[in-house]
Amino acid sequence: MRLGKMCGLLMKAFLAVLMLFVTAAAMEMEVYDEDDLAYAIDEKCENIILKGEYIPLDFLDQVVIDFDTVLNLNGNKLFSYFQITNGAQVTIKNGGFTAAGDPIIEVCGSDDEERPTVLILENLKIEASRGIQINNDGYTRVEVNNTEMQALSYHGWCLQISNAVEGNAGVDILVDGGDLFSAQGYVIECNGDAEVSIKNAKLGGAAGILMQAGSLTMENTALVTENNSTNPSIPTNTIAFTPATNAARVILTLGPGNQISSKSGAIFHIVPAAQGGVTAQIAITGGTFIAENGHPLFSALEGIEKVVEISGGSFPGISPEESAALAPCLSESITIDEDGNVAAKPQEPGVIVIHPNEENQTQSNPGTGAPINAIGQWLWSIVCWMHSQVR
């Protein structure tokens, strides 16, 4: 009996150790060729590390990833295209990524608010016909960090939000750093509702941003467009604001630190007639906007006051006609000076207006240039009034 019990205990211990090895194998796998990578995906490995310098995953269809994993390219190059779906949380990082497929990555949403589909791209160099397509069909979060991406095909884009325009089911997208370039189309197409944030990045190519639905905020980013193609169907606008008829909202916020310029056409192409009952707004709170080679800031001026609101920024070289057209778009206390800068309106003598800066520090009196001490000015005005009453 004792011998039997001992054998049983040894067998259990052996199986436990074996399970540890199996679990460890399932958690991480080094891949050297296409077969290794296909096996790692089939086994749903939590960490996949590329060791081969170039691995062409030559499948006819998208490779579907519906499990949590980190794909570490480890400085190597992968040829493939993926679909991330069903609440999977996927990170792809540290290497080159290319494909002739269209798009290179498709992200499909999750039905579970507590378990969104997540795609994180870090330190990648991507070349593809088209880049990342995010479907507004469920809860989704996408982050693109310090990634260089080139979309090379006709009407190719680096990021596209597609599907529903009526409402945001929980689609959040962040681009932080990196360089996104589209050779023959818009860099970013917001065709479906989402919350998009772009900061500290560089965007460029034939055209910039297409806004048809959702909300996009951009700050500390360079957006430079130039289209040298003779094909008239390739867009040239740096920012095209054409709200979809059924969109719940179309809101573009251009904040401080942006450098936005166009060499081939107008910076803004706005179609306010397409709004209908849509909440549509372009809020310019800072940044510099330069239309080069004689191009206008706006492709057309009619109706822009219905969409554009300006509280900061600089527009060097703006024409008198455009400056006049922007007057209804300006906040009440500001104007555009002769150099194209947004500035406080000149005040009548003796009138004190306090304009807080971005750090909420008090700035100078726009009428005299003298520093403003809000409490001191208030007390002094009371003293002056009392003195006048005594007299």
Where are these regions (language model features)?
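C-terminal cell-surface addressing/anchoring modules of secreted/extracellular proteins
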Residues: 349-391
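Sec-dependent signal peptide cleavage junction
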Residues: 21-30, 369-371
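N-terminal capping/linker segments that flank leucine-rich repeat
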Residues: 26-50, 342-344, 351-354
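Sec-dependent N-terminal signal peptides of Gram-positive bacterial secreted proteins and lipoproteins
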Residues: 6-26, 377, 381, 385
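N-terminal hydrophobic targeting signals that begin at the initiator methionine
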Residues: 1-4, 391
